[in-house]
A protein has these predicted regions:
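Thiol-/selenol-based redox modules, centered on thioredoxin-like
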Residues: 151-193
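Typically the conserved alpha-helix immediately C-terminal to a functionally engaged Cys/Sec
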Residues: 73-88
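N-terminal "domain-start" segment that seeds a small globular fold
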Residues: 22-54, 79
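Short active-site neighborhood of thiol/selenol oxidoreductases, capturing the structured segment around
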Residues: 54-75
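C-terminal motif of bacterial Sec signal peptides marking the signal peptidase cleavage site
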Residues: 15-16
Length: 193
């Protein structure tokens, strides 16, 4: 009898472990659910409204840092986000894409209002003072450095490129590296919905 109970207990434990493994979700992006950074932002959107992460509660929020004069990474990422929204179909209503400028000197409210919605009318561009942008970038662990080129007003900004994803409650969940495929991003977002 004791042998039977031990076999029964062992099989129940194995079953419980395998059920737990079946519940694990495998994301294409990096799971950063336990990160202790990138908690919030306090900036202004391209319509002049003050914005915080909590303003988008109830939606998945994708946050990307860049600048409007960026020749490659930023427009590519925003184009990929447009593709993600198309792949989501009607579920796109549950997602908010947020672009935070790293170039407050050139990226005015008016410029952001033209640039960001040109990719998708629902995308939001955020800006602030240099001090505000530096503070938010530091909190999000986003590297950015101005690189002067020919001419006084001609410069580029080297910056880290990736997208943060928050769930509907405002908790940081995923990080997508630059170049992550739109279908992979869309699949991960569907798993979070």
């Amino acid at each position: 009898m004791l042998k039977f109970l031990m076999v029964l207990f062992s099989s129940l434990m194995l079953n419980a472990c395998s059920d737990h493994q079946a519940e694990r979700v495998h994301f294409n992006g990096t799971d950063v659910s336990n990160a202790e950074y990138a908690k919030d932002f306090d900036l202004t959107d391209h319509l002049g409204q003050p914005r915080r992460l909590a303003d988008y509660k109830g939606k998945l929020v994708l946050v990307f840092f860049g600048y409007t004069h960026c020749p490659d990474v930023c427009p590519t990422t925003l184009t990929d986000m447009t593709k993600v929204m198309k792949l989501l179909g009607s579920q796109r209503e549950k997602v908010q894409v947020v672009f935070i400028t790293l170039d407050p000197e050139r990226d005015s409210r008016a410029l952001l209002a033209k640039y960001v919605p040109s990719f998708d009318a629902t995308f939001v561009g955020l800006y602030g003072t240099s001090a505000q942008i530096d503070k938010v970038a530091k909190d999000f662990k986003v590297f950015h450095e101005r690189k002067n080129t020919a001419g006084a007003e001609s410069y580029s900004i080297d910056h880290s490129a990736g997208t943060y994803v928050y769930d509907q409650s405002g908790k940081l969940r995923l990080y997508f590296k630059y170049g992550q495929k739109p279908h992979e991003i869309a699949n991960d977002l569907k798993m979070l919905m």
